[in-house]
Curated annotation (Swiss-Prot):
Protein name, UniProt field: Zinc finger protein with KRAB and SCAN domains 1
Listed Basic residues bias regions: 178-187
ZnF C2H2-type span: 376-398, 404-426, 432-454, 460-482, 488-510, 516-538
GO CC annotations, alphabetized: nucleus
Organism of origin: Rattus norvegicus (Rat)
Function: May be involved in transcriptional regulation.
Amino acid sequence: MMTAESREATGLSPQAAQEKDGIVIVKVEEEDEEDHMWGQDASLQETPPPDPEVFRQRFRRFCYQNTFGPREALNRLKELCHQWLRPEVNTKEQILELLVLEQFLSILPKELQVWLQEYRPDSGEEAVTLLEDLELDLSGQQVPGQVHGPEMLARGVVPLDPVQESSSFDHHEAAQSHFKHSSRKPRLLSPRALPATHVPAPQHEGNPRDQAMASALLTADSQAMVKIEDMAVSLILEEWGCQNLARRNLNRDSRQMNLGTVFSQGSENRNGSESTSKAEVKGDSTSHGEIAGRFQKEFGEKREQQGRVIERQQKNPEEKTGKEKKAPGPPTAKEKKPTTGERGPREKGKGLGRSFSLSANFNNTPEEIPSGAKTHRCDECGKCFTRSSSLIRHKIIHTGEKPYECNECGKAFSLNSNLVLHQRIHTGEKPHECNECGKAFSHSSNLILHQRIHSGEKPYECNECGKAFSQSSDLTKHQRIHTGEKPYECSECGKAFNRNSYLILHRRIHTREKPYKCTKCGKAFTRSSTLTLHHRIHARERASEYSPASLDTFGAFLKSCV
């Protein structure tokens, strides 16, 4: 009943309710713009692979009960693992990186896992970089008596006063959901906190959202507490969740001030109210309203002090860095709202950042950006992506940039993984060996295709005629026979072909290129098949050199040897 009431009070959407129950919905994004496999036909790029996160979850959540036997279960697991790790595309190092990244994310605290899911790091190094930046942001605002970094989030409990309730932060719905549905239970009564039973219900009439927020924060349990940890983590998710990697460095200073203000106020309020909380427990006659009044007074003084510092910083921006390093008090924030209803600079416009109001009223929250929204748009073709890294990779298609160059032959590539695969041509490295015949390959994808010769596996079947193929590219080419599609058109004469290889051969008619040369007579040809036919002419000429008389003499010689 408490869950239903909490959802009703805060207007929690069904999607947020699913996130509360641990159900993670991952959208399949078509963001890989270039095929990682070396030597595949260009037609394979027409169907980019889905998000690996979908296949990873399928692999991890696979149950034995869904199969008819152990062999089928094992084969299904192999198939799911292959779809997730993609050994035909990824190298050994990349597969190892995926496994280490998954384990690394699993050992992180729940809040950091949720935070990192917004960025979907591709490697462990990228995840560590994000966490180190977060730790630097927090450690830069060190508070006496507390620790640095994420450990700062796990200290202390703050009391919930009526004044605090009426002057609560301007949380959006995602932050409300995090407060109510946190997987960890609130701590029990301590000398640093007041029980929920000591907090009277608000009597004032105001915005219905005010009352909904207040009722959501109060629980029936007399020992329930609102922890500074949940508040801090919500602020981190709010500040960081809607910003991409490119914007993070630009907003670091303002975030440090914003987060530092919250932590500093939480520490000072906790220390200031510690003695009064102990007095409540021991039966002191001090009323809860007096404590709330003192807290409100101290809180108002801090806000006035922050407003004066902001004005000085706006007049003298050069003094900002020095003041942040020297001032022992709570840091200031440009985006903090000094007065009721006034919005910070980042709230004007696109809604990519968030500022929090410390006023007595709840202000309207700017429009939220969904977590799966494709906010990064290509100016050339208009295609959108969820991550800036995917947009950068996509732009290589338009710019033709190939920053990775081979030191041996000078050939350039747009992706580093393709360069690694190419360099094996020069080194002769063939790390992938067949267990059946011992044949080795430089690419894992070639080994997988080779193993189908031994197994006779043809997993790709045509829906029209039922013909099966061992490679998906062969099926794609075959299906064009039924559809009549000819996507490859010659720019010279306009003739179209259903295969890229046919177009390459056709272009040699216009360029007069003849790369296949006979070693006997020096004659050149445009196709290798034509050169093979030409070799038969020389073979017949050699056979005609042996006359019947010479053959009889050679036969007599063999008989004499016997």
